[in-house]
Regions:
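Hydrophobic alpha-helical membrane-insertion segments, chiefly the h-region
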Residues: 10-22
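Beta-sheet-rich non-transmembrane sensory/scaffold domains
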Residues: 21-630
């Protein structure tokens, strides 16, 4: 459970829609994306019948038990393949407030926009705040779960908005899997509960990744499920519509045998004990039509969604064994899944880039264990860049050739961060979820031109806690133990640090990628926002403490200038009588740039700022906490 894991983590760091089930077919799920097909050598094979699938699972169970008895583990990867009807085209006027990895692929978060309203998910409740016609006014609030649901043992983590549907994604230890709550929202910002569904899965939580994506009106989930040796049927992906008194027997399978795929490998190759599933649910017309595809493989996983494909990298970690892994690709155009045997493991979703030259680029570590729970925070090992053409994917029998791995310098320390920005892979280490450290000898920034192969190393005056794109360049954010630094990096043929801004006696208030936002207003200019807190604060404190303020910096040709901050007023906090999700797993502060206005989401406060003579001033604020309207 997250609660128990949280205690362990803290100790370590401190020291009415209808559910539609699709009948079995021999085809993959209809396409989500209408992008052109990138051909591969061959695709994976699905099972031809239920009996063939069960026989294979029995062999898997036997192999797993034998290997466990021998205390041997090996690595591999698995992925699922899923799609749905082509998504509705994005509205031209849509403006995102989420710092996503790829444009057009929304990610589950804590704040979204619906028409003239902000929609906020906070501590087990949904809220709307009117922003149309210059307003800033709370409108509606409801529990983020159904009226007949006991929210104890459930974490409501993410939220997405599609047309007039608000989707809340959580994980229920009590009801057994990913919990999806659907809510109606109208043009006046009024919220109303519609229905709840459960998708059978193990906990999807990652300290860095997000469990859901949204392309058009198609909701995409990834979820692992460990195989149950006693009853394999309890491991198959299934959906249940919730009602009072619902039982486990009401789960209905959404993956027939002929949409379960296996890599063409010997079972001795790896420790195979997990079913990895990608599910696509159609939210059009108020429905919840879910279809899924699964692949059987080892437990370690990292989930990445490009604009036209889903990738799952699954692996096993062993004591005295060479790392072996498999990466699976599921195109969103509806074509079949494919796989490739590989080595190592990515750190998180930002370790991936499907580039426009039709290559998959992945930073891998020799000792990586995926990004489930907090594994990304302790990632370590030798580093390499894997660069492989997408056409080389096949049925899992082929391996990426050794020359496709380029060994890279290994940075000292932990808190590993990586990201592809433009033509460069950028990585380094910082403080992560721990306390900021003073260690200048370890503060180096590594940059690799992934297409041309050149490498560069730059000396920093601080750690690498955040890597973000800023126009065609990058900004590196990190601490030196006392102050918070922003280094502007020009990404040309020879990368260089152009300038550095230092905010004295401050630290990052948020660690997740959604905590940052850069709003460009020219080719080389714009404004960035980032939550900040007191100096020396451990990264994990964002789970329990609010940020002090949102800091805003002006960028002009990679020269930073502070334009001010919008601060919280903790003295105005009230008891919200929290019943669910009382830990901020996804943080609680966001900079918001919307329709020429600037907001700071700070817990239960939304503060609006205005630029006067190049300085940020507070215009007004509203507290949208339950029972409070001011």
């Amino acid at each position: 459970m997250k609660t128990l894991l949280l205690l362990a983590l803290t100790a370590v760091i401190t020291s009415s829609s209808l559910l539609v089930l699709t009948a079995a077919t021999t085809e993959t799920i209809p396409p989500v994306s209408t992008s052109g097909v990138i051909p591969v050598q061959k695709t994976m094979k699905a099972f031809s019948s239920e009996s063939e699938l069960l026989a294979y699972l029995s062999r898997v169970a036997t192999s797993v038990q034998r290997r466990a008895d021998e205390e041997l583990q090996k690595s591999a990867l698995s992925v699922s393949s899923v799609s749905a009807e082509p998504p509705a085209p994005a509205k031209a006027e849509a403006e995102s407030v989420t710092n996503t990895q790829h444009a057009g692929v929304d990610e589950g978060g804590i704040v979204k926009v619906h028409g003239n309203h902000l929609v906020v998910l906070r501590r087990g409740r949904l809220f709307t705040v009117a922003i149309g016609d210059g307003a800033l006014r709370p409108i509606s609030s409801v529990d983020a779960y159904g009226p007949d649901i006991d929210p104890s043992g459930t974490w409501y983590d993410e939220m997405l908005v599609a047309d007039n549907t608000v989707v809340v994604i959580g994980y229920s230890y009590q009801r057994g899997g990913t919990e999806v709550g659907l809510f109606d929202i109208n043009s006046e910002g009024r919220l109303g509960y519609r229905s709840t569904y459960h998708l059978r899965s193990n906990d999807y939580y990652s300290s860095r990744n997000y469990a859901s994506r949204l392309i058009g009106n198609k909701l995409i989930f990834y979820a692992p499920e460990f195989l149950n040796d006693a009853d394999f049927s309890r491991s198959f992906p299934a959906v249940r519509k919730w009602h009072k008194g619902a039982t486990a027997s009401e789960f209905q399978r959404i993956v027939p045998a002929n949409r379960v795929y296996r890599p063409e490998i010997n079972l001795d190759f790896t420790y195979v004990n997990t079913m990895h599933t990608v599910t696509v649910c159609d939210l059009a017309n108020g429905g919840f039509d879910c279809q899924a595809t699964s692949v059987i493989g080892p437990p370690g996983h990292v989930f990445y969604v490009s604009p036209d494909s889903v990738y799952v990298w699954a692996s096993t970690w062993g004591r005295n064994e060479k790392n072996r892994s498999i990466v699976f690709r599921m195109p969103l155009d509806g074509s079949g899944p494919s796989a490739l045997r590989v080595s190592g493991s990515p750190v998180d979703q930002f370790s991936f880039l499907q580039s426009e030259d039709e290559y998959l680029n992945v930073l891998v570590q020799s000792s990586g264990k995926g990004d489930g729970m907090w594994r990304a925070e302790v990632a370590n090992g030798d580093v390499a860049l894997l660069r492989i053409p997408i056409w080389s994917f096949s049925d899992g029998s082929d391996a990426a050739p050794s020359w496709s791995y380029r060994p890279l310098p290994k940075p000292a320390g932990y808190g590993f961060q990586n990201r592809f920005v433009g033509r460069y892979l950028i990585y380094g280490t910082g403080s992560g979820w721990g306390y900021p450290r003073e260690n200048e000898a370890k503060w180096n920034l590594f940059l690799v031109d992934w297409a041309r192969g050149s490498s560069h190393q730059l000396k920093l005056a601080h750690g690498v806690d955040r890597i973000e794109q800023m126009g065609s360049d990058a900004v590196i954010v990190g601490s030196d133990g006392k102050d918070l630094h922003f280094s502007a990096v020009r990404l040309r043929q020879w990368p260089e640090i152009v300038s550095r801004y230092t905010r004295k006696e401050a630290s990052q208030g948020e660690l997740r990628s959604h905590g940052f936002f850069y709003k460009p207003d020219g080719d080389d200019s714009g404004m960035l926002g980032l939550p900040i807190s007191v100096p020396g604060r451990a990264g994990n404190k964002h789970l329990f403490e609010n940020s002090a303020a949102i800091l805003f910096l002006r960028n002009d040709s990679l020269q930073f200038r502070e334009i001010g901050e919008l601060g919280s007023q903790p003295e105005r906090a009230i008891d919200d009588r929290c019943r669910a999700s009382c830990v901020d797993w996804y943080g609680n502060a966001r900079p918001l740039f919307l329709r020429g206005r600037v907001f700071a989401l700070l817990g239960y406060e939304i503060v609006e700022g205005r630029l006067d003579d190049g300085r940020m001033h507070e215009l007004r604020r509203v507290n949208y906490a339950p029972g409070q309207r001011s």
